[in-house]
Regions:
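Conserved N-terminal catalytic core of the sugar/cofactor nucleotidyltransferase
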Residues: 2-104, 111-119, 123-228, 454, ...
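Conserved short loop/turn motifs at secondary-structure junctions
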Residues: 149-159, 234-237, 366-370, 374
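Hydrophobic/aromatic beta-strand patches that form the interior of the parallel beta-sheet core
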Residues: 103, 122, 152, 173-175, ...
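Conserved core of the sugar-phosphate nucleotidyltransferase
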Residues: 160-314, 318-322
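Left-handed beta-helix
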Residues: 2-101, 247-486
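Residues immediately flanking
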Residues: 106-107, 234, 314, 375
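Short His-Asn-centered micro-motif
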Residues: 124, 134, 153-157, 177, ...
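Short capping/connector residues at structural and topological boundaries
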Residues: 114, 118, 126-129, 242, ...
């Protein structure tokens, strides 16, 4: 069976490496690995993509659950801060715009918001989607530098076709990342589901490096003189091209730079930074035992949070991958699909900060971190609290606190219930329990609560609500806490 597995590969270096991995697992697991390879064969994945799948399966079947013990870690301190970097890096950055590519992670569907298409195609106002803001920012820097900065959209199989149909920019590259079968934990075999789309998952954004290399795009960019890539999530519009960071990476001869920001108590889903064996280390929450989550959340011990924005020196990456593949720490992501327990075997691109020489973590302000993960975030982004600039950047000061019932969890429902958007006063608090249709643009001041237990949405025709709690029944709205201005 091992010979059959190795028959999928041609590279002598990969063959030698995989033989070592396969020697570490039993023949029973070889049978399971072969089943995954056969399932993936019709996709014609690159040799690197298949290699990554086999390595991940060998690690998982060998008992690697991706858990990183906190006992061997120490706080990450003394990182350079963007606000304290010399302004002369701006000049270097401006002179280096011709060497820059911008890469956006565009594989997400926004399933937490009920989306069935690319999250980047969600509207943030009637005229702009996330992708429009991204293109506006790239075009701004193209204009400033008079250079055709390449934009690369890393898509999953979920988002590739729809994104390509929605973006006509001539300097945009559409890169398809690998996909792998979901693993049925009951049998170790590939998942069999009622719909084929449910049987697959992207292997995490750590796949970026090998997808770039296997597609040939990495070498193409380097051959064109592109030496630096700025990479960020497409749902984080605060992650824009930054001259000082670009100039710093180049002037300090770094191969890899990760942007981290001071962690808040609300920063839980995502990665924290620490030190391991004298190197920066990325800790995704799923890589930490639940018994240690309370410690992980202590900002005194783990004060920095991963923004998932990185800067890469592309010739260094190309040189590394021409010698051997990267093996990033494993992430075991449990899911339930149609009642079946499965795992997705993934990696995170930020984990490369621990492996690559000349890598560094740079502390950036929260103004570079505004991920939109929920409809609460989307309400705020669509409001007056966030200034959307023509150059694709965003700015904000104080943000409101919003609590929503499940009726608002999906984007389509949100757009139906709040079609005109909401405006907020500084430090406003809004609680919505039950579906409320805001018939007009509404300004929220102070603490406002609207609730009802009716089966159908209730209309609200107010243009302003201030320090009030209202409850609706069949006869209409009733004030429980009067408006303080009355």
């Amino acid at each position: 069976m091992m010979a059959d597995i190795l028959g999928f590969f041609n590279s002598p270096a990969i063959l030698l490496e995989l033989q070592t991995w396969l020697d570490a697992v039993s023949p029973t697991h070889h049978h399971r690995i072969m089943a995954h390879l056969k399932k993936a064969a019709p996709l014609h994945l690159s040799e690197l993509g298949l290699r990554d799948m086999v390595v991940a399966l060998c690690r998982y079947f060998s008992g690697d659950q991706g858990i990183i013990p906190l006992s061997g870690l120490s706080p990450l301190v003394d990182c350079p801060k963007l606000d304290e970097l010399s302004s002369h890096y701006d000049t270097i950055g401006l002179q280096s715009l011709s060497k820059l590519a911008c890469i956006k992670l565009n594989g997400g569907l926004g399933t937490t918001m009920g989306c069935d298409g690319p999250k980047s195609l969600i509207h943030i106002d009637p005229h702009h989607r996330f992708i429009d803001m991204i293109l506006a920012n790239v075009n701004e820097w193209r204009s400033r530098g008079n250079v055709p900065i390449p934009l690369v959209l890393l898509n999953s199989y979920h988002t590739m076709a729809e994104t390509m149909a929605s973006v006509s920019d001539p300097h945009t590259h559409f890169l398809l990342q690998h996909q792998v079968p979901r693993l049925d934990t009951r049998s170790g075999m590939p998942l069999i589901a009622s719909h084929s789309d449910l049987e697959w998952n992207p292997p995490g954004h750590g796949d970026l490096f090998h997808s770039l290399y296997a597609s040939g795009l990495l070498k193409t960019l380097v051959d064109q003189g592109i030496t630096v890539a700025f990479v960020a999530n497409s749902d984080n519009l605060a992650a824009t091209i930054h001259l000082r960071l670009l100039g710093y990476l180049i002037a300090e001869d770094l191969s890899f730079m990760l942007e981290a920001t001071p962690k808040l108590p609300t920063d839980q889903k995502g990665g924290s930074l620490a030190m391991r064996n004298g190197r920066p280390c990325l800790l995704e929450r799923s890589q930490v035992s639940p018994d240690d989550w309370e410690l992980l959340d202590q900002t005194s011990q783990y004060p920095l949070f991963n923004t998932n924005s990185i800067w890469i020196h592309l010739p260094s990456l190309l040189s590394i991958l021409e010698k051997s593949p990267m093996t990033l720490p494993l992430i075991v992501n449990p899911k339930v699909v149609e009642g079946v327990p499965v795992v997705q075997l993934e990696t995170a691109m930020g984990a490369a900060v621990e492996q690559l020489e000349q890598s560094q973590v740079v502390v950036v302000p929260r103004s570079r971190f505004f991920p939109v993960k929920t409809t609460r975030d989307l309400i705020v982004l669509r409001s007056n609290c966030v200034q959307k600039n023509r150059d694709g950047s965003i700015e904000w000061n104080t943000l409101p606190s919003i609590s929503l019932s499940s009726h608002y969890q999906e984007v389509n429902a949100l757009s139906h219930l709040i079609p005109h958007g909401l405006q907020f006063d500084a430090n406003a608090t809004l609680t919505l329990n039950g579906p409320v249709v805001f018939q007009k643009p509404c300004y929220i001041r102070g603490d406002v609560t609207l609730s009802h237990a009716l089966s159908e949405p209730v209309a609200c025709g107010e243009v302003e609500l201030a320090n009030v709690t209202k409850q609706a029944d069949e006869s209409g709205w009733h004030v429980l806490v009067p408006d303080s201005s009355s």
